From Swiss-Prot:
It comes from Bacillus caldolyticus. The keyword Oxidoreductase applies. Substrate binds at residues 86, 92, 124-127, 152-155, 233. The gene is ldh. This is L-lactate dehydrogenase. Its main location: cytoplasm. Its EC number is 1.1.1.27. The lineage of its organism: Bacteria, Bacillati, Bacillota, Bacilli, Bacillales.
Length: 317
């Protein structure tokens, strides 16, 4: 049972991403209870000890401990960060065979506890594994969320802000689609201070247009670059997961680019994919269908088709 009647988050998988996410939760005071579960129990025990030793410095100290699947029964949110890691040269979709089996075991164990909360999935390929979590759990699709393109969108806003010398918080631009090689930028709706980004570069000539495309390529390929340099990405996605968690637990109705189930929006059905969605205490309140130009529509449908072709190997649809 919950110790204080507050919010409980269970983190499954305390590798680089899971531990960084728990650290972000502690530092931002987002949850009242944080439970760490890992196949390597010793790692989870050590992480819990380490976090507790720093609790005195936290803005809102949480109760944090290593636990087991029974702790999911009273959880508001279960965040899955477990699974095989992406190696140099691997695409996110290369991981699917390894991680589907892992996820079946995890999700069935969570549901056996009597869990009635929300799932947030971070493991790659995140769109595929979010769909798998929905299927394995039997929960309504609005209560199963993937991290989607939240980090890609953050990278996009950062690089555009750097290029235009403005704070990334004031850049309004989205990356949608698969969290992976077929994702796309929505240039037609991107703006800074209400001024379309395409208009901002009109007077700067062809080289400025090429620079925008280079910015997107750097966003799309950022994970490959980071993995090559340091072996894994974890700080950025951990902060993105913390942002989604805050939107859920604080009932914010925040619009974030997560992996959401589509059943009509954007002309797609039966697929989880990165799109802007309203996030609150109940999960995904609604998908925001932004207007796309013809090229963006075609690229989005291609991205969805790529995901569906992978899903067809594992699920009858």
């Amino acid at each position: 049972m919950k110790n204080n009647g507050g919010t409980r988050v269970v983190v499954i998988g305390t590798g680089f991403v899971g531990a960084s996410y728990a650290f972000a939760l502690m530092n931002q005071g987002i949850a009242d209870e944080i439970v760490l579960i890992d196949a390597n129990e010793s790692k989870a025990i050590g992480d819990a000890m380490d976090f507790n030793h720093g609790k005195v410095f936290a803005p809102k100290p949480a109760d944090i401990w290593h636990g087991d699947y029974d702790d999911c029964r009273d959880a508001d949110l279960v965040v899955i960060c477990a699974g095989a890691n992406q190696k140099p040269g691997e695409t996110r979709l290369d991981l699917v065979d390894k991680n589907i089996a892992i996820f079946r075991s995890i999700v069935e164990s969570v549901m056996a506890s009597g869990f009635q909360g929300l799932f947030l999935v971070a493991t790659n390929p995140v769109d595929i594994l979010t769909y798998a979590t929905w299927k394995f759990s039997g929960l309504p699709h609005e209560r199963v969320i993937g991290s989607g393109t939240i980090l890609d969108t953050a990278r996009f806003r950062f690089l555009l802000g750097e290029y235009f010398s403005v704070a990334p918080q004031n850049v309004h631009a989205y990356i949608i689609g698969e969290h992976g090689d077929t994702e796309l930028p929505v240039w037609s709706q991107a703006d800074i201070g209400g001024v379309p980004i395409r208009k901002l570069v009109e007077s700067k000539g062809e080289e400025a247009q090429k620079e925008l495309e280079r910015i997107f390529v750097n966003v799309r390929d950022a994970a490959y670059q980071i993995i090559e340099k340091k072996g894994a990405t974890y700080y950025g996605i951990a902060m993105g997961l913390a942002r989604v968690t805050r939107a859920i637990l604080h009932n914010e109705n925040a619009i974030l680019t997560v992996s959401a189930y589509l059943d009509g929006p954007y002309g797609e059905r039966d697929v989880y994919i990165g799109v802007p969605a309203v996030i609150n205490r109940n999960g995904i309140r609604e998908v925001i269908e932004i207007e796309l130009n013809d090229d963006e529509k075609n690229r989005f449908h291609h991205s969805a088709a790529t995901l569906k072709s992978v899903l067809a190997r594992f699920f009858t649809r």
